[in-house]
Regions:
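A glycine- and Lys/Arg-enriched "phosphate-lid" helix/loop adjacent to the NTP-binding pocket
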Residues: 98-101, 105-158
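Generic enzyme active-site microenvironment
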Residues: 5-8, 90-91, 127
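Anionic group-transfer/hydrolysis microenvironments
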Residues: 9, 94-95, 99-100, 129, ...
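Short, well-ordered beta-strand core segments
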Residues: 89, 123-125, 169
Length: 193
């Protein structure tokens, strides 16, 4: 079993990348379980998502982070139970959520997360300029999360890049075709490794 994590800031195209990786692996006859965080089918995931849309700042963001962590841990237990039934597991969003904490805490928080939670086999970071991310977020027509402003997205991106060592970085500023080609190159390099 290979465990893939696809992560990045809001609006980067993580879900699109996750779908592509899943479709590609399934086209090769592999069975794939894909889990996107926060998960809609789990209470803690729905609560985390709800808190992300609350006005009022830091208090709600802290609660969202707490429920996000609970959601991820629940997914890890779920994979432990059913993972043997799949060739591959994909998590869309995982440890890069630490980039949403204050900048001074990001490296330490990331090291703690990496030492406490299981480390995936393949880590893919979907990168994008904050302006393009915001355009895509607005195009979706959903209500904005508290972090989805140009300034906050730029800060989050800087923090993500601080902790991206060991990640495959794909640039999603271009077309879906470009994204697919980059992801396919990552998958090929993993097969050859």
């Amino acid at each position: 079993m290979t465990w893939y994590v696809i992560d990045g800031m809001d609006g980067s195209g993580k879900s699109t990348a996750g779908r592509f990786v899943k479709d590609h692996l399934e086209s090769e006859g592999r069975s794939v379980l894909e889990i996107t965080h926060p998960t809609e089918h789990r209470v803690v995931g729905r609560i985390a998502d709800r808190f992300l849309h609350m006005p009022g700042g830091k208090f709600w963001e802290l609660l969202a982070a707490l429920f996000y962590i609970l959601d991820v841990v629940a997914s890890l237990f779920y994979v432990r139970r059913v993972g043997k039934n799949y060739d591959d597991i994909i998590f869309v969003r995982y440890s890069m959520a630490v980039a949403y904490v204050p900048a001074g805490l990001v490296p330490l928080t990331y090291r703690i997360v990496e030492s406490v939670l299981p480390v995936p086999d393949v880590k893919i970071l979907v990168d994008i300029e904050p302006e393009i991310a915001l355009e895509r977020i607005l195009f979706r027509g959903e209500s904005l999360e508290s972090f989805e402003t140009p300034e906050r997205l730029a800060k989050v991106r800087r923090k993500i890049m601080m902790i991206s060592d060991g990640w495959y970085i794909v640039d999603n500023a271009g077309s879906d075709i470009s994204l697919r080609e980059q992801l396919l190159a990552v998958l090929r390099s993993e097969v050859m490794a």
